[in-house]
Every structure is written in C-alpha cells, then in structure tokens.
Regions:
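C-terminal helical cap(s) of enzyme catalytic domains, especially alpha/beta-barrels
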Residues: 1-11, 123-142
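Flexible loop residues that form catalytic
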Residues: 116
Length: 142
C-alpha cells in the first residue's frame, strides 16, 4: 500500500482542476459493541478470503455460526491471521482509533470503509444488519 501510494504521488501530473494528488485507502471493517462480537462477525469473510487466496471454489458466504463450526484449517491459519491483521475489527473506540491511525500512517485524504461483517443464521446474507451496524457504530465513534 505504501509503495503504491508513493508511486502515485511521485508520478502525479497536476492540472488546473487538481493541482495536488488526492488519495484514499479502502479498509475492510467490522465494528460491534464488543471486540468479541466483532471477532465472531468477521469469521465468514475470513473464510471467504482464505478460499479465494488458496484457489478453493468460492461458495455463497456462510453464516457466522457456519464459519465458526468449520473454522480455518491449520495450514491456512497464518494466511487468515495475516489478512485479518490488515482489517479493522473491534469495538467502536478501537475501530475509530485504528481508522485514524491508518489514515495518518498512509497520509491519505479519505478512508473508504468496506463493511464486511457476516450474518447470523436466519438473517438475510445480502442485507446484513451487522454491516449496517458497523457503519453506524464507526460513524458515531469518529
């Protein structure tokens, strides 16, 4: 990320309308009232991304309960941990602090939040209330 931003900034061609480069960072985010709840809600996306990165077939996203029951195979756990470490997962205060930290670290103008919280069994996967809650809690904490 830092290298890509540096290349963009170094190669930026100013124009009258845009004299300075503008940058943004996209971050996968899961926010819940507690850290433990956020960790549960991120599990379906972790499993989906591990499948994508290891060449497994992509299936419809699992519920939180399905992801917890299946877990991540031991051989893929380091990959899962490495990916999730770059995401923002936590309670509102933790998440807001991490978003601010990332914005400062990469010196970006904007942070684009991609809510990736999973759904519990019986909740429509395509309209995850936890994704809406992620945005609401993060906005309130910012």
């Amino acid at each position: 990320t830092a290298e890509a931003l540096a290349l963009y900034r170094e190669g930026y061609q100013p124009s009258p309308e845009h004299p300075e480069p503008r940058t943004f960072l996209t971050v996968n985010v899961v926010v819940a009232p507690t850290q433990a709840q956020a960790q549960r809600l991120v599990q379906p996306m972790v499993r989906t991304m591990v499948a994508l990165r290891t060449g497994q077939p992509l299936m419809p996203q699992e519920s939180v309960e399905e992801a917890e029951a299946r877990g991540v195979v031991a051989a893929h756990q380091p990959l899962a941990d490495e990916m999730a470490s770059r995401w923002v997962v936590g309670d509102p205060q933790q998440a807001a602090a991490r978003v601010r930290e990332l914005a400062a670290t990469f010196d970006v103008d904007e942070v684009m939040v991609s809510p990736v919280a999973g759904s519990f069994a019986g909740t429509p996967v395509r309209r995850s209330p936890a994704r809406e809650e992620t945005l609401r809690l993060l906005a309130d904490a910012m």
